[in-house]
Amino acid sequence: MAKTIMIQGTMSNAGKSLLAAGLCRVLKQDGYRVAPFKSQNMALNSFITKDGGEMGRAQVVQAEAAGIEPDVRMNPILLKPTTDVGSQVIVNGRVQGNLPAMEYYRRKRDLIPAVMEAYESLAREYDIIVIEGAGSPAEINLQENDIVNMGLARMVDAPVLLVGDIDRGGVFAQLYGTVALQSEEDRRRIKGVVVNKFRGDRAILEPGLKTLEELCGVPVAGVVPYLHVDIDDEDSLSERFGRDKEPRLIDIAAIRLPRISNFTDFSPFERYENVSLRYVERARDLRAPDMIVIPGTKSTIADLQWLRQSGLEASIQKAASGGTLVFGVCGGYQMLGRHISDPEQVEAAGVTEIDGMGLLPLETVFQGEKVQTQTNGVFSGVAGLFSELNGKRYAGYEIHMGRSEEARGALFSMGNVYGSYVHGIFDEQEVADTILKALCTKKGVSFESLGTFDARAYKERQYDLLADAVRAGLDMPLIYRILNQEV
């Protein structure tokens, strides 16, 4: 069976996901077969595996860092919020239904066999399992039925690294308070604490680190710097949306829907030096972009209503009539159509039908069975400015409850309006390059001036940079002693 180490945090966004990815990469570089694991993840940003299972993207990133194929066993329970008090529950990659938060809380221990089966299966195949917790183990109101933090650590007998975020302040209180709120048994599981997202001279921290070790009774296992790496992890979501980029040579405006999902669909455009990708949630901020993109959403009808009430729908329609390129993905694609109906209340929005934006001749009906599959092929029948896509390969995945009449092929177009059900459709560098070349031609600027790069080599380099920082920041001899149960 595999050795294991678990990364828990003092709070959400402490940097657990990225640190786990970095540790996966370090261990891979050191010659180990390593796999990530998170028993329960709550996220709208999901991925479809080769066998059609749905899992959280954080574990996909960690699997990529480890150099292995993403597998739903790495994230056996995925919760996708549908309302403020309920989620769609996905177990082993398949939808089980929608549950209110309290009902799920009462029933989640019934899922322990699924969690353990997934973990034990991975542990038989790999040398090391890097486990990520969720939120904080100090949420004492949730400890009784916990299956993702100390509850899971007990089930799989995992040693724990506790991570605190110094960038938001109060890291010593975070770490000491979290340790203090654990039972004696669980405190013994904490083998080291990590100060994460540090900026500055470590020497300034040393007196505090020494006192922290004395108070907690465990060693400081590392001080990891604030990382400037370009990796699609969930902890970067608020930072990504918070950027107020000024328009560059090519300006792309992405609509920041309230229930946005798979925001990483547009990440490829961010990596060109002279392309700006702005997330917009107010009509006055739309300005005059070269392309408007409408992302996927967990609640198409509710977000279409928001788009209408905010004035953004009218602004998008006006821009489209003036020749601006508009591109919708999944839920955004459905919104661009004429009509959406939900007779079975799949989205539980309290609305059975709604008119769409009327920019594509599309009729969408939501059904109970979810489409979830990887897809790839060659573009054909693409008209208009992006016609150069024809003959080029694409790869991605579909996750949606709705079926749309008139939807043909991977990309449906009418004039300057385009739509697709395929998440990740821009990930192939040739696809992103072709779209940007077309936008450059329309604008009369040189594509070469955008700054080009090798996307695959770039991604691998980012994982290596992450590993370099994690290796330098962590006490790796201590980490290996923890893995070998010598601490």
Q: Residue locations for each model-derived region?
A:
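A conserved active-site-flanking secondary-structure segment within enzyme catalytic domains
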Residues: G337-G391
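Catalytic nucleophile serine of serine hydrolases
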Residues: C330
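Short active-site segment of divalent metal-dependent hydrolases/proteases
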Residues: Y333-Q334, F426
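Flexible phosphate-sensing "switch/lid" loops adjacent to ATP/NTP-binding sites
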Residues: M1-A320, L325, D342-Q345, G368-E369, ...
